[in-house]
A protein has these predicted regions:
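Hydrophobic, aromatic-enriched alpha-helical segments typical of multi-pass transmembrane helices
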Residues: 4-40, 44, 48-187
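Beta-rich carbohydrate-recognition and catalytic domains
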Residues: 192-194
């Protein structure tokens, strides 16, 4: 397999999270009455939201990028971390396909979101030791910390009025770890040092 062919799946771990974060950051500023401190990102993709198309596109890019990243992770790093990455990607696509209604809740959306959060926090936790073995010992502690912070922030979204901020913090840490590890995989596949 050529280096370019090995490179593009890992790039999904950068492109997907960056596109998703850009979508919620830009669209959240544009939607009147929306608060990134107290409102969930899913509200930007709700059936009645004027930002629905853009936020759904961001979710779709995340949902396709993460399974590609999972392929690259599986090629280099043993263990179940890749499966957690693929799961969070699939859950992102499910969240996009099951938008919040104009009023009320959508239980299937909530289930997809919770599974997506749990699998996102699991990626760095499950990959910590094998990733450190392959890519350098310096990855182990930060990977565990990223998984713990991601999971804690996302679990804390149920506790109070700053749920939007906690959601963004948890997602930023989890997606940030994925993007950093994807860059390390890209460098390794090109023959560079990790």
């Amino acid at each position: 397999m050529t280096p370019a062919a090995r490179r593009w799946p890992a790039a999904g771990g950068v492109v997907g999270p960056v596109a998703f974060a850009a979508a919620w950051a830009v669209l959240g500023r544009r939607q009147a009455g929306y608060s990134p401190i107290s409102d969930a990102i899913s509200q930007l993709a709700a059936t009645d939201a004027p930002t629905r198309a853009g936020m759904t596109a961001g979710l779709a890019l995340l949902g396709t990028g993460l399974p590609l990243y999972a392929v690259a992770l599986r090629r280099v790093v043993p263990g179940p971390g890749w499966a957690a990455a693929a799961t969070t990607g699939a859950c992102s696509l499910a969240v996009a396909a099951l938008p919040l209604p104009a009023s009320g809740d959508r239980p299937a959306h909530a289930v997809a979101a919770v599974l997506g959060y749990a699998s996102l926090a699991a990626v760095p936790l499950l990959a910590a030791t094998p990733f450190a073995r392959r890519m350098g010992a310096g990855w182990k502690a930060p990977s565990r910390l990223a998984g713990a912070v991601c999971g804690t922030c996302l679990a804390a979204t149920t506790l109070g009025p700053a749920s939007g901020l906690l959601q963004r913090a948890g997602l930023a840490v989890g997606h940030g770890w994925i993007a950093a590890s994807a860059v390390a995989l890209l460098r390794r596949q090109d023959g560079g040092s990790a």
